[in-house]
């Protein structure tokens, strides 16, 4: 498979972002969908409900330890690395601050609610849009 001519002199990260952006926009135009990450809020603008889910650092470390069976030091390292990676990606492609809650219409601290409650709440939000 050969790369499209318009992409020959573009960095691969830019080509990938442009391709993902097109897929996100095409998918959202066809049907309602849930998109996690990939700067979907930026790509879709006001045509979507943008949601930012977060939790305190210690809670995220605890979740990594429980879900992935990691030791505390390893879990802390992974959480920091993921935050750094997400921040760099989002800020590079959007020129926005990654964890600026003002970029989103709905922000939820997941440490304060059960997963079941959050799913029901989001289903209700969707029904009333």
Predicted regions and their residues:
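Small-molecule kinase domains that catalyze NTP-dependent phosphoryl transfer to phosphate-bearing small molecules
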Residues: 1-3, 71-116
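A common structural junction motif
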Residues: 126-129
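Conserved phosphate-donor/acceptor-positioning beta-strand/loop module used by diverse small-molecule
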Residues: 46-81
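ATP-dependent small-molecule kinase phosphotransfer cores
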Residues: 1-32, 70
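Solvent-exposed alpha-helices and their adjacent loops that cap or buttress functional pockets
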Residues: 26-27, 43-44, 98-101
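Short, polar loop motifs at secondary-structure junctions
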Residues: 36-41
């Amino acid at each position: 498979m050969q790369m499209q001519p318009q992409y020959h002199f573009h960095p691969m990260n830019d080509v990938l972002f442009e391709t993902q952006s097109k897929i996100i926009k095409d998918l959202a135009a066809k049907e309602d969908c849930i998109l996690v990450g990939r700067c979907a809020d930026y790509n879709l603008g006001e045509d979507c409900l943008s949601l930012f889910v977060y939790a305190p650092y210690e809670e995220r470390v605890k979740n990594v330890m429980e879900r992935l069976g990691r030791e505390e030091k390893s879990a802390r390292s992974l959480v920091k690395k993921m935050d750094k990676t997400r921040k760099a990606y989002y800020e590079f492609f959007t020129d926005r601050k990654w964890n600026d809650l003002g970029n989103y219409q709905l922000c939820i601290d997941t440490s304060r609610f059960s997963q079941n409650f959050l799913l029901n709440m989001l289903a209700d939000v969707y029904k009333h849009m």
